[in-house]
């Protein structure tokens, strides 16, 4: 059974796309406004957080899912660390962690004799102490800290 894991560099590509989409949407909507000036994505995030302009509030409502997705990914970046995030950290679904360990332990050089019966849930509970957890799209994932 192949365990499906995520890699943060794939999420990073989605994040960059979201940032571009949010910024383009904002620029297209407000480029004619008297207060408008070009800004970085980070500057845009700060601006919309502090803005009291009703048009900006309406734009935020219409762009809610993209903003939510970007903020969720920023939370992962905060936990993983930006350097590691962009390098591609493997995210393992928590509910599949015992199966993941059973699959990868031999590849890591651990030979388990056939006559032993391993309770992989117990192994996962012990090994989980060496991992950190993040949540992405409602799913909890472990990653190696």
Task: Tell me what each language-model feature is.
Residues 1-145:
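Acidic interaction surfaces
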């Amino acid at each position: 059974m192949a365990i499906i894991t995520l890699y943060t560099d794939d999420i990073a590509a989605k994040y960059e796309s979201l940032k571009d989409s949010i910024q383009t949407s904002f620029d297209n909507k407000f480029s004619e406004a008297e207060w408008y000036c070009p800004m970085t994505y980070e500057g845009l995030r700060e601006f919309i957080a502090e803005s009291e302009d009703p048009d900006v509030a309406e734009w935020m409502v219409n762009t809610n899912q993209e903003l939510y997705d970007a903020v969720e990914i920023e939370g992962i970046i905060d936990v993983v660390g930006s350097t590691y995030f962009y390098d591609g950290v493997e995210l393992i679904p928590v509910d599949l962690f015992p199966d993941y360990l059973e699959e990868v332990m031999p590849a890591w050089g651990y030979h388990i004799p056939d006559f032993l019966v391993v309770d992989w849930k117990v192994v996962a509970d012990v090994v989980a102490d060496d991992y950190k957890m993040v949540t992405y799209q409602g799913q909890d994932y472990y990653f190696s800290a």
